[in-house]
Amino acid sequence: LNGDGIIIAVIGEYPYAGGYGDNETLSINSFDQDILKKCYNSGKKVIVIMLSGRPLIIKDHIQKWDGFLAAWLPGMAGEGVSDIIFGDYNPTGRLSFSWPKNIKQIPIDYTDENYDPLFKFGFGLNY
């Protein structure tokens, strides 16, 4: 964390689908939270790449991030993530679901009466 520049923090879920089954939490795990705290305390810009198979609850963190890329589970397509980070490709993806602010919003649907997600169905940014 020394020196100039920005920090690219790669966080995500521990593998769960191929082994012991479902993971019951949608929170950022404690190890990644500790990493993020160190990044925040550095005073540098922080770009977060999240590797997960579903939206995690990030509301308490995202305001501290200067950039965010939900890379999902890219597998062999991970090279595409670096293309986006280094500006070789302009991201064009859109959410095919609503990203909840908190666990109490689950299940969430864009037709819900009090619909107020963190990111709405169809949300997506590019450069």
Question: Can you annotate each of these PLM segments?
Answer:
Residues 1-127:
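C-terminal non-catalytic regions of proteins with extracellular/luminal or membrane-system context
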